[in-house]
């Protein structure tokens, strides 16, 4: 099942997602807080099977209109009779501060991961499941700090944003270090109850083992939705996006089976579409 997934809508990014086959208790009242405990299977192969022990405590009161949720995931395995995993168990700890405001909300997320969770926390694709035990990542550690939210900026304007910093050391089986940051803003102007114009700007840059990378995107879209809310769905969107590779010429680049570039690319591209 989809188990208490946490995502950032404007970047389609799940920062905590341990969904899978399993069981447990959910939203058990402990005073004013809500406790959830679960055991979830996380892959199986000839060497054995992986599992996630997931514990969460939500609705911890802080200051006015603010609450804290803490989550701990422990990824452990059982080995088959003749099986052996090179990867150790990993820990994933998360803290989420949710702040309600008169014109929207804001969340700040802090996450730390060890071993196979280190590489997940240092990237935008890791959320807690699909733990890799195929190699030794046992000294790895990673973390990320994220701030995001949605707010009204007047009668006709709404905006979503995401700020993120991610870093890690001794990642993967090659033991590399990495760091990166990302800035995304999506303002939306509402013409009426169904039609809106959406603007989006995003920037991502960092380095992997002292090699820089970076990219940016600018999008303009005309959209129609069933309602005037930022979250109104379904939505039909006609868009145009300008993409930039700030360090390389990767757009349209062609590589052979061994990874050698056989046709050079460019450092920018423009795409249009409808969805």
From Swiss-Prot:
GO terms for cellular component: cell outer membrane; pore complex. It is a multi-pass membrane protein. The record marks 105, 231 as: Greasy slide, important in sugar transport. It holds the Pfam family LamB. It is found in: Cell outer membrane. Induction: By maltose. It comes from the Bacteria. Keywords: Cell outer membrane, Ion transport, Membrane, Porin, Sugar transport, Transmembrane, Transmembrane beta strand, Transport. Gene3D superfamilies: Porin, LamB type. The keyword Ribonucleoprotein does not apply. Coiled coil: none annotated. It catalyses: beta-maltose(in) = beta-maltose(out). GO terms for biological process: monoatomic ion transport; polysaccharide transport. The record marks 14 as: Important in sugar transport. GO terms for molecular function: carbohydrate transmembrane transporter activity; porin activity. Belongs to the porin LamB (TC 1.B.3) family. Involved in the transport of maltose and maltodextrins. Homotrimer formed of three 18-stranded antiparallel beta-barrels, containing three independent channels. This is Maltoporin. It comes from Vibrio parahaemolyticus. The lineage of its organism: Bacteria, Pseudomonadati, Pseudomonadota, Gammaproteobacteria, Vibrionales.
């Amino acid at each position: 099942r989809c188990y208490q997934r946490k995502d950032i809508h404007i970047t389609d990014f799940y920062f905590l997602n341990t969904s899978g086959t399993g069981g447990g208790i959910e939203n058990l009242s402990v005073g004013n807080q809500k406790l959830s405990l679960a055991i979830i299977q996380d892959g199986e192969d000839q060497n054995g099977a992986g599992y996630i022990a997931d514990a969460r405590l939500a609705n911890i009161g802080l200051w006015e209109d603010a609450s804290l949720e803490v989550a701990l995931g422990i990824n452990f395995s059982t080995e088959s009779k003749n099986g052996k995993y090179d990867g150790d168990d990993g820990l994933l700890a998360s803290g989420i501060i949710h702040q309600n405001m008169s014109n929207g909300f804001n969340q700040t997320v802090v996450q730390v991961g060890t071993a196979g969770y280190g590489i997940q926390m240092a990237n935008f694709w890791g959320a807690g499941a699909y733990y890799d035990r195929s190699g030794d990542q046992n000294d790895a550690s990673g973390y990320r700090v994220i701030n995001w939210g949605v707010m009204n900026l007047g009668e006709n304007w709404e905006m979503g944003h995401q700020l993120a910093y991610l870093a890690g050391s001794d990642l993967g089986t090659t033991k590399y270090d990495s760091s990166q940051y990302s800035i995304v803003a999506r303002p939306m102007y509402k013409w009426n109850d169904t039609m809106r114009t959406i603007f989006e700007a995003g920037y991502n840059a960092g380095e992997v083992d002292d090699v820089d990378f970076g990219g940016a995107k600018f999008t303009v879209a005309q959209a129609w939705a069933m309602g005037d809310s930022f979250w109104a769905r379904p939505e039909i969107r006609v868009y145009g996006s300008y993409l930039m590779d700030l360090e390389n010429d990767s757009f349209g680049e062609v590589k052979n089976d061994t990874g050698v570039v056989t046709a050079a690319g460019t450092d920018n591209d423009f795409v249009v579409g409808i969805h």
